[in-house]
Regions:
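Soluble, non-transmembrane catalytic domains of enzymes that act on hydrophobic metabolites at membranes
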Residues: 1-13
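Compositionally biased regions
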Residues: 4-6, 38, 279
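Low-complexity, intrinsically disordered short peptide segments enriched in small/polar/basic residues
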Residues: 10-11, 41, 46-48, 246, ...
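Class I SAM-dependent methyltransferase Rossmann-like catalytic core
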Residues: 16-44, 48, 61, 67-131, ...
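S-adenosylmethionine/decaboxylated-SAM
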Residues: 32, 87, 92-110, 127-294
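Alpha-helical hydrophobic membrane-insertion segments
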Residues: 51-61
Length: 294
């Protein structure tokens, strides 16, 4: 870390994790499992009638169910799975995720491992495509901090990272799409642009552009896009941004929609836009949408 504030945040996170018991990447969840499940299906019909009847009654009344553990390998950010998340143990991911937490300035793990993994995957594949990286809705810079940390050759590449945001701590008004003090502050939103710039100071060719979208898109001199990350928390603004930038995303380029399957309004709006622009959206279990430009 190049600055003291980043080092302080890193030390606080390390100490917090040291005091936390258990494996944060493999929480366990509860589910309901019937004692009588071994009699499920036609096998139960092999039992005598006087044995079957109490089982049927208890099953209908659900008296025979007790909680059992299910070995989730990941349970956070709106999803739970028993799949093998081998990426969690790779040095590339561990370093990138830690860097994201440093950018957040919060010692408590936000549980965004799967979301960060998806962003890293998108960015890694987009490095092979001609064009810049663009993020609309940067906040404190959590996701792109992880992305850049995962790309050791970034400073040697010809790509730029263009980060658009109002860099305001206040929530978004659903009617106007503007930041409003009435909606209070948001923990992942930036307090000011200076702090965000300091966070990205270790990387070259990172440009922060302040203002409301889509109006500020003209300031970036964007010609070709390899990777577009959209996280504006406001459906009309996201639609306007994607419509304005879609033609500049190169074939094979990737668009990542952060709130696609988490907010109904944004889901509906993007589905309509997908039909209009003829692209397909892959819905991920953690609620994001991934589009690969044909």
């Amino acid at each position: 870390m190049e600055n003291n504030s980043n080092q302080l945040a890193a030390n606080q996170i390390i100490e917090h994790d040291r005091l936390t018991f258990g494996d944060q990447f493999a929480p366990k969840g509860w589910y309901w499992h019937a004692f009588g499940s071994k009699f499920a299906g036609p096998r139960i019909l092999r039992l005598p009638v006087l044995v079957r009847m109490p089982i049927f009654i208890l099953r209908n009344l659900r008296f025979y169910r007790l909680p059992r553990r299910i070995p989730f390998t990941f349970d956070a950010d709106g999803m739970a799975t028993m799949a093998i998340p081998s990426f969690l143990k790779t040095s590339k991911f561990v370093s990138a995720y830690f860097r994201m937490r440093v950018a957040s300035r919060a010692v408590v793990d936000p549980g965004l491992q799967w979301r960060v993994h998806q962003a890293i995957w998108c960015a890694s594949n987009s490095m092979k495509i001609e064009g810049d990286f663009v993020e609309c809705g940067t906040g404190k810079g959590l996701m792109m901090s992880a992305v850049l940390d995962s790309l050791p050759d970034w400073n040697n590449s010809s790509k730029r990272m263009l980060l658009f945001d109002t860099f305001s701590p206040f929530g978004i008004d659903s009617t106007t799409g503007k930041n409003s003090e009435e909606h209070g502050t948001r923990g992942t939103y930036a307090t000011n642009i200076e702090d965000v710039a300091q966070n990205f100071s270790e990387w070259q060719k990172v440009e922060l552009i302040k203002g409301f979208l889509p109006e500020t898109l003209t300031q970036g001199n964007i010609e070709k896009i390899a990777f577009l990350h959209v996280d504006l928390n406001h459906a009309p603004a996201e639609v306007s941004v994607v419509r304005a930038l879609w033609s500049r995303i190169q074939s094979g380029g990737i668009m990542l929609l952060d709130d696609y399957a988490q907010v109904q309004q944004q889901n509906d709006a993007m589905n309509e836009l997908a039909q209009e622009l003829s692209f397909e959206i892959l819905t991920t279990a953690s609620g994001q949408g991934i589009v690969i430009k044909p």
